[in-house]
């Protein structure tokens, strides 16, 4: 399968590594300014969760291939920061690069807006479960064994089976939620609840330390669960039926103090979950999650005292 990845970011490159190892041709679409100094290869440290529940540490090399203009790919993965999705699609259009788009990112927009971004491209919505950071020519990442994928009926692309075959070949499983747009909103609301608690105590300068402080305190985690409940009310006010997402939301239904203790134990025991929490350190993205949910909550008149108090303490 021919795959293009937009940019050389952490998430796109982590999946690119998995696909390349499975024998697929993977190329990165880079801006002109980045093309000339793109590294030929990256050293990779990966906590790989595909084969063991605790994950395996892998040390490897990833070969970087840069995409040329006017080419056609089976799939083009776009894992970009909020606000840049439209721009990302424009870059592809400008370079006359064709293929089915896989949107692989957080957004607080409606399906109609996503369709406008895609324009004449076929597209499907998915959501990665990977994270990490990139420094110079080194990728330090975490990869879980599954990702979220829009169902075949809703996606309406002709090569859906090719995509699931690609995932299977890289030993990745997928889950199909009721509706991918709503699922992403819920995911953002949960993120906003957690990070607003973690970050309220100070600047987002050091997200890694904030995450560690949160994971080590069951009382902070209990408070995070209360903040998540408020954030979910915002999603509900947008017209989402939360009953359709029972499995995802189960942990936030039990009493907060019990859930807080359970979460603390889970973080202590599961290095995969712990590591992804500390590696999610994109300050802009964290702030965008909190800000989007909070502003919509205000517009829709949702009562959210905890979120409100937290947002006052957050600055980038």
Model-inferred region functions:
Residues 3, 25-27, 101, 123, ...:
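Hydrophobic anchor at the start of a short beta-strand
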Residues 138-151, 201-213, 269-280:
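Helix-loop-beta segment of a Rossmann-like dinucleotide-binding subdomain
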Residues 112-189:
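Rossmann-fold dinucleotide-binding core
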Residues 30-32, 67-68, 105, 127, ...:
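Residues at the C-termini of beta-strands that transition into short coil/loop
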Residues 181-211, 219-232:
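Active-site-proximal catalytic alpha-helix in oxidoreductases
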